[in-house]
Amino acid sequence: MTSNQQRVVVKVGSSSLTSLHGEISSKKLEKLVEQIVRLKDEGHEVLLVSSGAVAAGYRKLGFINRPDTLPEKQASASVGQGLLIEAYSKLFLSHGYIASQILITKSDFSDEKRYNNVRNTMNVLLKRGIIPIINENDTVTVNRLKFGDNDTLSAKVAGLIDADLLTILSDIDGLYDANPRKTPDAALVQEVTEITPEIEASAGDAGSEVGTGGMKSKLDAFKITMASGIKGFLGRADTPGILHEAICGTARGTYFIPNADSHALNHKKQWIAFNSGPEGDIVVHNESKEFIIDRKKSLYPSSIYDINGRFSNGSVVRILDQEGEEIGLGVVNFSSSQLRKWKKDTNQETAASSQAVVDREAFVCHLELSVPL
């Protein structure tokens, strides 16, 4: 790609793809594809994160209304995902582009090897001119192992592939200083450089009845992209030419701009911070916090006050102070059993004192993030 060409993740929610009756609207699908095709014709790489599997499938199972129970939703998604990707593929092919399908579960991201494998696959597809279409594998995913919604998934995918821009298309114009559905004179916020508690409180939870992601989930998604050094945009899906304008910086909506002075998290730290899932805790002496946070030092055995849980070498653990306040997350070089042996045996601890328990390169401090760990 040239300097003017960008790698863009486009996320579209169910509410932006469905009719008033809750079914997939072929007209809305066609308009979305036409906008993505324009980006492709301009030389951009585009990855689409698309909801809509349940909406595409539930009528085929004989349901009059969108189902409420998990088995019914998963059955609807099983039928709908095939129909949705078929519709996308035909539309893109009519413009000369090939689409691919990638169904992801949270466990694909929590395992580092699979996480890296997903990235490699996506990079090959994008470099070969393919349009990957991503969705969570709703048919096999249970609630406790879900991303939560496709807003979160799209943000993590954007970081995974080093995207230049994440564009979330919805049924609202952007972020307002109050909920526009409840406050008629609410003003559109054009640019956000920090997502503060005040912004979150004023946003409320404006969302649609069709999708699962309200404004809170979108703000959480943009916290992830901002920590990863990626620009974000939130705008209305039915605005003509909005994807092109979003790249040009002229679209009506809200831009989320990462801090140019802060260091963006690399892939390793993104995985640790947003995907890994801690398996235990290491409690450090309070006087060690300065070395870990301010002086950015690795964590050594002499700093350990206590160890909670059972974990193996290579696991991700939480680093806590003596009051239980979380300092960050890190990958440990030693198992919990080995660390406990060192704690009991002063001679062994002394012999191991030069070996880092958590290397600085494998540690993410909460101060590095604009999103809670």
UniProtKB/Swiss-Prot annotation:
InterPro entries tied to this protein: AceGlu_kinase-like_sf, Asp/Glu/Uridylate_kinase, G5K_ProB, Glu/AcGlu_kinase, Glu_5kinase, Glu_5kinase/COase_Synthase, PUA, PUA-like_sf
Entry binding sites for ATP: 11, 170-171, 212-218
Listed GO MF terms: ATP binding; glutamate 5-kinase activity; RNA binding
Taxonomic source organism: Bacillus licheniformis (strain ATCC 14580 / DSM 13 / JCM 2505 / CCUG 7422 / NBRC 12200 / NCIMB 9375 / NCTC 10341 / NRRL NRS-1264 / Gibson 46)
Protein name per the record: Glutamate 5-kinase 2
Domain PUA: 279-355
Protein role: Catalyzes the transfer of a phosphate group to glutamate to form L-glutamate 5-phosphate.
A Pfam family per the record: PUA
Enzyme class: transferase
